[in-house]
């Protein structure tokens, strides 16, 4: 008796969505239903292979972003899986923070954050929080990933007393001078040097 060959009536995936860290991989399994399935097989395609490539259902995360993986049957059926690839903030580059001057208020420098040569956007790709930034000494800024970025990275910076300004010199005699200046917030002493 000759068997009637019919294409699969449907195809499903074991994952409707998938989140991967850049450089990682995972396998998506396809299952066909209905029909004989004797001549049906699944082919795979990525909407953006620079973000996520696929080979026989194995998805490899190539770059940060989103891509759609589609499984096609020879019978014309298809099903999709949305892949999100995330980058680690620990792999980002953060610009050095120069020494800051104490102001009596919170000192909050804004470092530039780049990932793979791309400048990230504050409050879209990451958020910042500060520690010990209201006093003279060492402070820190913590970068926390957001959206397509994950994890944290901390950078330290120094806060020093502001430079003395409005220095005035007046003579009080042949062997003495009087110095006056604007008070520096946070300074508890001043050093005066004499140069011959």
Language-model regions, residue ranges each:
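Extracytoplasmic soluble-region selector
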Residues: 1-91, 99-101, 105-138, 142-157
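N-terminal non-catalytic regions of secreted/periplasmic and cell-surface proteins
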Residues: 92-93, 177
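Glycine-centered loop/turn positions within well-structured domains
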Residues: 50, 67, 175, 188-190
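Extracellular low-complexity, O-glycosylation-prone stalks/linkers
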Residues: 184-196
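Pro/Thr/Ser/Gly-rich low-complexity, intrinsically disordered linker/stalk tracts
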Residues: 160-186
């Amino acid at each position: 008796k000759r068997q009637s060959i019919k294409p699969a009536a449907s195809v499903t995936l074991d994952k409707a969505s998938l989140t991967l860290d850049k450089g990682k991989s995972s396998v998506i399994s396809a299952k066909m239903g209905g029909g004989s399935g004797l001549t049906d097989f699944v082919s795979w395609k990525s909407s953006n292979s620079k973000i996520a490539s696929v080979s026989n259902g194995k998805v490899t995360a190539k770059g940060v972003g989103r891509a759609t993986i589609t499984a096609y049957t020879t019978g014309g059926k298809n099903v999709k899986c949305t892949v999100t690839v995330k980058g680690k903030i620990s792999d980002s580059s953060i610009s050095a923070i120069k020494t800051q001057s104490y102001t009596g208020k919170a000192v909050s420098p804004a470092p530039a954050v780049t990932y793979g040569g791309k400048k990230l956007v504050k409050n879209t790709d990451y958020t910042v929080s500060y520690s010990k930034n209201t006093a003279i000494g060492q402070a820190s800024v913590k970068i926390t990933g957001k959206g397509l970025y994950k994890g944290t990275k901390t950078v330290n910076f120094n806060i020093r007393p502001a430079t003395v300004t409005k220095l005035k010199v007046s003579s009080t005699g042949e062997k003495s001078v009087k110095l006056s200046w604007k008070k520096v917030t946070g300074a508890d002493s001043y050093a005066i040097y004499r140069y011959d």
